[in-house]
Swiss-Prot record:
Cofactor (UniProt): Zn(2+)
Role: Catalyzes the hydrolysis of UDP-3-O-myristoyl-N-acetylglucosamine to form UDP-3-O-myristoylglucosamine and acetate, the committed step in lipid A biosynthesis.
NCBIfam families associated with the record: lpxC (TIGR00325)
Pathway field: Glycolipid biosynthesis; lipid IV(A) biosynthesis; lipid IV(A) from (3R)-3-hydroxytetradecanoyl-[acyl-carrier-protein] and UDP-N-acetyl-alpha-D-glucosamine: step 2/6
Listed name of the protein: UDP-3-O-acyl-N-acetylglucosamine deacetylase
GO CC terms in record: membrane
Molecular function, one GO term: UDP-3-O-acyl-N-acetylglucosamine deacetylase activity
Amino acid sequence: MIKQRTLKNVVRATGVGVHTGEKVYLTLRPAPPNTGIIFCRTDLDPVVQIPARVNYIGDTSLSTCLTKGDVRIATVEHLLSALAGVGVDNLYIDLTSPELPIMDGSAGPFVFLIQSAGIEEQNAPKEFIRIKQRVKIEEADKSVMVEPYNGFKISFGIDFDHPLFNEHNQNATLDFSSTSYVKEVSRARTFGFLSDYEFIRKNNLALGASLDNALVLDEYKILNQDGLRYPDEFVKHKILDVIGDLYLLGRSLIGSFSGVKSGHTLNSQLLKQLLATKSAWEIVTFKDPSELPFAYTPVAMTA
């Protein structure tokens, strides 16, 4: 039987919210089988818990935000991406601020935290959501789609008019049966343009942004002295975001995702449309490990 997984130990980190600029204390705690991923605002009395599920998605303008009443938790996608990438099903995430810490702008530090805590199997079958038929949403020149595939694959295309972008680094297809999330995706950082920075700051956003937690581009070049971590780091970060958004389905996806110029808003619309189309998916478990798509085997997920 393919089993659910949680952390072996509690692990903590401190960081800054990229939009609020506020210091935040983060604690990851093991959770029982069938809990799912639960965010806990421990700075509130009483503590407010928000499950990482599609029906709690709120604002998606610059990040994916979860809301419950008037309580919000912003920028959840990078940590969720890390949890999906290494296969953690059940977890309590305590935080002392309305936004998760941005860390270095990627999922890499979260992967390190998870690996430091250790992962253990639980005595309950792991559930997957398997795509049975295509679901697609288009909006002008943007589109997102999921379709059947016996594995986990993401294709993504971006289109920026900038000297650093070309067709080689604006399109990527990653099949996770042969691609290591940890090595090839998790370290891709969020990026932004200096030309947008003034507008964003005027709107009291990106108050915690810096060259330490984002790739920043002027008209011609990257301002970060260390340059790119991957030749296609920009599009790989978009794929990192997609993996985090998809994990709001509450289960790992068996299927293929394709996106063109999409962001958190279109991604969330696709998730809602998918769940509303009952014939397009099914929940599956695997008693026989040999039937599990290779992308989700321990060998693939720990590479």
